[in-house]
């Protein structure tokens, strides 16, 4: 893998692999105060990769309703995807936009005025993703455009690409992709296995002046630890918090989605899959299982995407079996090695 300091135009400019210039921002953009309504939070839910799963959305809202204190729910992109039925599309968008929302590549391309835009699905897929997946994703996006009204497209276009939030003492950058692009793969679990790339990510944190980035986009969850030296010589732990997907399974044999919960109190329910403690022991970060009826969801999915359709070909196996990935792989120390779920549950930063 080649680590890059800045997001640069993809060598492959083909639809679905390119990363358009208007997707980009700088790590320095995050070195600002959070807006007032996202400061001093007790609980923050970050929901990425909902993918038009209305049943998962209902479950997210139920879980969030249980929370107390100063709380906010943020959908950080790709909340549309499988919702090709106009009624479902409208319901998903209406409920999502009642809360804080960012646009991912899906929403950005849905909002594009030029339906022939060469970005395709805007996924900026890396080279380990096959051409067939890329081509099918481009066609899924093209079909999804037919479900959106001009008014809905305008609402999507108005959404920001990133945001800042504070939970307790923790400064978070909220993104869809990574610290340089809404479709960046710099926070993918595959890339974060590479030591030189983790050094690049650490420099992004230095420039962004945040303690954590909460992200999604790359479809597999990872909580990756990074360290930074403080002026007084102490070591501070920072985190990439990637929830994988809320609307699809994230682990083999577990058909639940995941959301990232960042809070000043621990999560006590059985939905918790893994987590860490940071902010000098004051902030709990957990991956919460979004448990919806898998049979009902599969029936809904098949109505819009029957066998032989692009989404069915690309996603049916994952929806029914989950990816070849385990919870023990999802929480990693500064060397990129997995932490046990027990250690991850009790680990704290040194600052």
Residue ranges of predicted features:
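Short, basic, glycine/proline-bearing loop/turn elements
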Residues: 70-78, 139, 181-188
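Active-site neighborhood of divalent metal-dependent phosphoester bond hydrolases
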Residues: 86-164, 195-204
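Acidic, His/Gly-enriched loop-helix segments that form or flank divalent-metal centers
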Residues: 144-287, 292
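Short aromatic-enriched loop/helix-cap "lid" or pocket-rim segments at secondary-structure transitions
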Residues: 112-117, 186-187, 254, 298-300
